[in-house]
């Protein structure tokens, strides 16, 4: 019997390291990636390189899983590719984790605009905004709302903080090139840059939320939260990890709404009055999932062992704990 983690984010390594000591010796751990990433795949018992083409990859995964008696396939970053083929995996006796239980929920999670609309309809506090598709629309939306709100912008489709910028008027236009990690850009420079694109991607202009930011990593099963760790992201770059917090209760409502399944991550931020608003749910493990191990609550093990129908070992958890992310390195072998 085996468990297979397909290509994910960089946190695929953290998941493999969390799983290996918790699996019985007769459960083989497999990993794969489209690129040569030995620092990730060497953490598994067996590793493969995935085909580049999506359609080819799905059939290759299904065939390979059957050949090696793999009972659980975790789709990683490409849940939308595998979800339409769930019935084929189930027919082969293989459990499939994609982040949700149907393709439409995955598509709605991927669209910040549709995600916000569904949350609003369900009465869930969410960071909503205005979709723009060209420079003229962007300029009009900014002009209509800049007096009432500090504004920010991000792609309608994207993961985590990719493409997020705050719109600031009283700022040197060149500052965004000197300190890009500040994520601040002059309003006019952004409008000019967006207008210059021949095929601009849809963007979401939103009121900027100035309050505390949280991230919640969760084990979910068909819309039910099984275990969760909330991470309070502090200004000094440290994070406070908690097993109990009101933002987890907020996350439960969103998970139920979108029938989340597997390990997913919710991001939220407070407004000036302290009210938390959901920013997004990423239907895959976050880049910070490895930090949660400092609580001794092994989310990866809980997720996989429950799927395999195996008992969960007792975990001597700690909460709250404070961590600070570091940059480190590992030796890797060269490609053959």
Can you describe what each PLM-predicted range is?
Residues 40-42, 58-60, 105-112, 161-163, ...:
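Short, charged, surface-exposed secondary-structure boundary motifs
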Residues 177-254, 258-259, 269-277:
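Phosphate-binding site of ATP-dependent enzymes
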Residues 106-203, 232:
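Active-site nucleotide/adenylate-binding loops and adjacent lid/helix of ATP-dependent enzymes
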Residues 68, 234-237, 241-336:
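ATP-dependent carboxylate activation and anion-phosphoryl transfer catalytic cores
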Residues 1-102, 136:
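ATP-binding N-terminal substructure of ATP-dependent carboxylate-amine bond-forming enzymes
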Residues 1-32, 66-77, 131, 173-179, ...:
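Preference for protein termini
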């Amino acid at each position: 019997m085996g468990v297979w983690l397909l290509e994910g984010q960089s946190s695929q390594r953290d998941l493999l390291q969390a799983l290996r000591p918790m699996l019985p010796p007769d459960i083989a751990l497999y990993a794969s990636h489209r690129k040569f990433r030995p620092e990730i795949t060497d953490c598994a018992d067996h590793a493969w390189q995935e085909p580049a083409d999506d359609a080819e990859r799905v059939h290759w995964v299904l065939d390979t899983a059957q050949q090696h008696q793999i009972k659980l396939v975790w789709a990683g970053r490409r849940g939308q590719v595998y979800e339409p083929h769930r019935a084929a995996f189930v027919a082969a006796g293989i459990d499939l984790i994609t982040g949700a239980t149907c393709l439409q929920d995955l598509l709605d999670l991927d669209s910040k605009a549709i995600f916000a609309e569904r949350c609003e309809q369900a009465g869930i506090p969410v960071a909503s905004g205005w979709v723009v598709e060209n420079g003229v629309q962007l300029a009009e939306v900014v002009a209509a709302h800049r007096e009432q709100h500090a504004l920010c912008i991000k792609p309608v489709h994207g993961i985590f903080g990719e493409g997020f910028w705050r719109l600031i008027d009283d700022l040197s236009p060149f500052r965004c090139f000197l300190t890009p990690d500040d994520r601040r850009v002059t309003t006019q420079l952004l409008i000019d840059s967006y207008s210059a694109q021949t095929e601009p991607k849809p963007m979401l202009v939103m009121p900027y939320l100035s309050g505390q930011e949280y991230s919640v990593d969760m084990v979910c099963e068909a819309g039910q939260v099984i275990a969760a760790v909330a991470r309070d992201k502090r200004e000094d770059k440290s994070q406070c990890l908690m097993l109990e917090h009101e933002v987890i209760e907020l996350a439960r409502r969103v998970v139920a709404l979108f029938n989340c399944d597997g390990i997913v991550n919710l991001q939220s931020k407070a407004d000036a009055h302290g009210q938390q608003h959901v920013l997004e749910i990423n239907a895959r493990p976050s880049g910070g999932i490895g930090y949660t191990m400092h609580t001794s609550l092994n989310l990866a093990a809980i997720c996989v062992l429950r799927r395999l129908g195996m008992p969960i070992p007792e975990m001597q958890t700690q909460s709250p704990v404070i961590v600070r992310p570091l940059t480190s390195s590992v030796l890797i072998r060269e490609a053959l």
